[in-house]
Amino acid sequence: MAGDMEFKSWGYTQINVQKFCYNWTISNFSFCMGAHQKSITSPVFSLEASKEVAWCLRLYPNGVDEESKDYLSVYLELLSALESPILAKFEFWIINSQGEKYQSRKISNVQCFLQYEHRGFKKFLLRGLLLSHMNWFLPEDQFTICCKVSIVGTVFDMPVQKRTPAIKDPRHMLTDDLGELWENSLFTDCCLLVAGHEFKAHKAILAARSPVFRAMFENEMKESLKNPIEIMDLDLDVFKEMMGFIYTGKAPHLHSHSMACDVLPAADKYGLVGLKVLCEDVLCRNLSVKTAAHTLILADLNSTEKLKSQALDFIAIHACEVSETSEWKSMWKSHPHLVAEAFHSLASAKCSFLEPNVVLESSQL
């Protein structure tokens, strides 16, 4: 209709978030690792600006229950607050002997704390991993754990005339734009054939992100002269996840053990270090008695030392259970050198368990 006008308005609501970090160092920590030690409680702490909200950390050296007996469990507990509940997010990590942040675990969703309620991780760190690397985790027999807490505070509105719209993060804009080039096949200059499907792509982006594609185009290999370039060794879903990462740095479907198992070899073959790290993280978090042997094989085949170390440590802790699985029995035949490495890791862990007793006996002579 002539004369119609569109009016736009916007508002701004600010949610205050208070953040603080608490470092807790426990001396002579090796003495807490015996079966008799149920839990250790930190000193009470609070945010400087909110003294009325008091917290503490609780650490269980032998786990909090039967299921977590092979792990250290750690929790954040609300001790007191003028108003309840308290809404907060939190993150735990360890400081190793090099002063580095290790084993970061965070809660991504806001948690609701009532007084004396606690939230945390009952499988925070494998006891066997700690005992077999005591010099790294316990410098001078001191264990340092850190907790970052983000507390949701007051909510208030700001007048429209005093606020301008926020500017979108340019890094996100870049990945969105590159993703659009891929999704909509805009201005492409090469074609990839995967499982009978053709995909238009950009040589410059492929070469910049993957040394394998770069070598292919630089050296004018046979594949670079063909159109389309046939990719023989990738499943269609794996290819799409890999290409999505190449263009955007994201892998939105990489959350299951099976998907990570399929994507890891592709990431290794095409030199996508960032994608390998994402796969390692998923596989580490999904380690279980059932998956341990297969994960160890994958780590060995694709040169992922962190994942291999985690798998060996897990197998050392759960040796009896893992050795009964069909995957382990199959590995005896297909990858005997990994079985030997697993036994070596188990022997090292056992030596660490026995070491305090040996010292005790020698002191009694």
Swiss-Prot record:
It holds the Pfam family MATH_2. Gene3D superfamilies: 6.10.250.3030, 6.20.250.50, Apoptosis, Tumor Necrosis Factor Receptor Associated Protein 2, Chain A (2.60.210.10), Potassium Channel Kv1.1, Chain A (3.30.710.10). It comes from the Eukaryota. One of its GO terms (biological process) is protein catabolic process. Residues 188-250 form the BTB domain. Residues 19-149 form the MATH domain. InterPro entries: BTB/POZ_dom, MATH/TRAF_dom, SKP1/BTB/POZ_sf, TRAF-like. PANTHER family: SPECKLE-TYPE POZ PROTEIN. Belongs to the Tdpoz family. This is TD and POZ domain-containing protein 3. It comes from Mus musculus (Mouse). The lineage of its organism: Eukaryota, Metazoa, Chordata, Craniata, Vertebrata. The gene is Tdpoz3.
